[in-house]
Amino acid sequence: MGRPYVTLNLNGMFMDKFKPYSKSNAPITTLEKLSKALSISVEELKAIAELPLDEKYTLKEIPKIDGSKRIVYSLHPKMRLLQSRINKRIFKELVVFPSFLFGSVPSKNDVLNSNVKRDYVSCAKAHCGAKTVLKVDISNFFDNIHRDLVRSVFEEILHIKDEALEYLVDICTKDDFVVQGALTSSYIATLCLFAVEGDVVRRAQRKGLVYTRLVDDITVSSKISNYDFSQMQSHIERMLSEHDLPINKRKTKIFHCSSEPIKVHGLRVDYDSPRLPSDEVKRIRASIHNLKLLAAKNNTKTSVAYRKEFNRCMGRVNKLGRVAHEKYESFKKQLQAIKPMPSKRDVAVIDAAIKSLELSYSKGNQNKHWYKRKYDLTRYKMIILTRSESFKEKLECFKSRLASLKPL
């Protein structure tokens, strides 16, 4: 017989497929090695670490549906660059994720090599055909992930040690906890239960249950009606308690197909594949109808408000595409007929963006990461000008100016 709980990594070593692991066994121990891995100089790494805390993170308050406020932070540009590199060069490149984790999981780094998009739709699909579902919500997840958990992620999964380890732990936390709004936080949150979560999943599978976690949402399902989840819920609560992670009792519930259609991450799972609830499709249709009425009014399609409403509506239609809904192509075609149109305001915004690039280029910044982002964003802003012949001359002028400002 084979070994059902292990798989071979790239180095030919047997790895537990219920735990995340690194493709590389080479330890990163010094700032010099970290600098090489991230392509950021040691001097720059030190300069970023020495930024005042209130410059690294700027507090923002976002209203929640229940009337309370969510505290998030925006990053200093240099912190954003550093954390982006950590994500790209370490989490995305090196970590192989077990199949029960969804959200911040690159599809290419799947332990099953399935190359499936690991988003909320794929997560819901794992539970299709369920007749009883347990949902456990972790309360204020990021705010309760202590630096000790962050350290264990970098040290035990990624073999990062010594001064490189302490540096990364400091960069990825604020006041000893993970930061809501930091680029690295969702990866850390996805990985931080690695030491014990695999054992809970094994227990679930032995009982014929399906276990998934999408960041802070744990879902366990059974194809048996009125399944008793008390033992499994106890295992999950113990796992979270051991990591000092509180459960949101209000959002932790058991759902039965006999009483209502079962939904996971907003999608119905009482079919062979995930479906949007019928009332959601009706709301999308109504939204398109209202947008058409708005588009018929003079100059509306050039307004900021219309553009915002169009993008929101397109996002909802794209959800239909993700679940292969029969109305997707029809709704998309209707929206494409009423796209937002350019205005003189767009010309002014693009002109200002190119002037800013010209100034940055003259100062020799064309090899900087932030310069490339500004350049790409400016090109993106120009797309809307292609929708009107009236702006053809301006568009060609902008293209000509940008051609001499390419990043290195």
Curated annotation (Swiss-Prot):
Q: Which GO terms describe its molecular function?
A: metal ion binding; RNA binding; RNA-directed DNA polymerase activity
The reply to whether DNA damage figures as a keyword in the UniProt entry is no
What EC number(s) are associated with this protein in UniProt? Answer: 2.7.7.49
Looking at the keywords, is Transferase present? Answer: yes
Give start and end of each Reverse transcriptase domain: 43-269
Q: Which reaction does it catalyse?
A: DNA(n) + a 2'-deoxyribonucleoside 5'-triphosphate = DNA(n+1) + diphosphate
Tell me which residues bind Mg(2+).
137, 216-217
Q: GO biological process: any one?
A: defense response to virus
A Pfam family matched by this chain, by name? RVT_1
Listed A to Z, the keywords are: Antiviral defense, Magnesium, Metal-binding, Nucleotidyltransferase, RNA-binding, RNA-directed DNA polymerase, Transferase
Tell me, in a sentence or two, what this protein's role is. Reverse transcriptase (RT) component of antiviral defense system retron Ec48, composed of a non-coding RNA (ncRNA), this reverse transcriptase (RT) and the following membrane protein. Expression of this retron confers protection against bacteriophages lambda, T2, T4, T5 and T7. At multiplicity of infection (MOI) of 0.02 cultures grow normally when infected with lambda without collapsing, at MOI 2 cultures enter growth stasis. At MOI 3 cell membranes are permeabilized within 15 minutes of infection but do not lyse, suggesting the phage are not able to finish a replication cycle.
The UniProt family comment states: Belongs to the bacterial reverse transcriptase family.
The name this protein carries in UniProt is: Retron Ec48 reverse transcriptase
Gene source species: Escherichia coli
